[in-house]
Amino acid sequence: MYDAIEHGWYSYLNGHTLFFIPNNLDQDFQHLADTLDAFVITGGDDIALRRTVETKLASAMMQRNKPVVGICHGAFLLTDLLGGTIVDVDLHMEQLHPVMYFGEVKIVNSFHNIGIDKLHSTGTVLCTDELGHIESWIDGTLAGVVWHPERMDQPWLPDEIETLLFKENK
């Protein structure tokens, strides 16, 4: 396992100021949450220290009602923290597959072997895969996306999450 940011995020978030949070417990998460407009929990390995840092900052952001968007690993982390259910999924490792977004078929990528089976009680499902697993969800200022938009030739996120993540003048 390694700890690094996917290079696709640089181009995907072009024009936005990026601040990378080190996996260090000796930092002021409350101050970080005060200074950040949003927190994106990117994909990657589920390393204990990383998970602890992300959980502390996500909690501080939630206290301030600021956007927290989880991508892949981040979506699973938020789902778990909020009481959703994660299950093993076959046939999703390193391939494209369809998701349903309010009756519209979208093609997304997949790099995992787990999925979201049930969402916490206040979340709204935005996209599901062909087996009914939840691929994206939103709950106020919190959102999860199982695929990697930063690894797509034409990145796509549901409109609700695009608005949450990229809205101006927060």
Residues covered by each model-derived region:
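N-terminal beta1-alpha1 cap of cysteine-dependent amidohydrolase-like domains
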Residues: M1-H73, L81, V87, H92-E94, ...
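A generic "binding-loop/recognition-motif" signal
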Residues: G74, H112
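An acidic, glycine-rich "communication" segment
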Residues: D88-S110
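Conserved hydrophobic/aromatic beta-strand scaffold that supports enzyme active sites
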Residues: P98, I134-S136, G144
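Active-site-proximal beta-strand elements of phosphoester/diester hydrolases
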Residues: I107-V108, A143-H148
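Substrate-binding strand-loop-helix patch
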Residues: N109, G115-K118
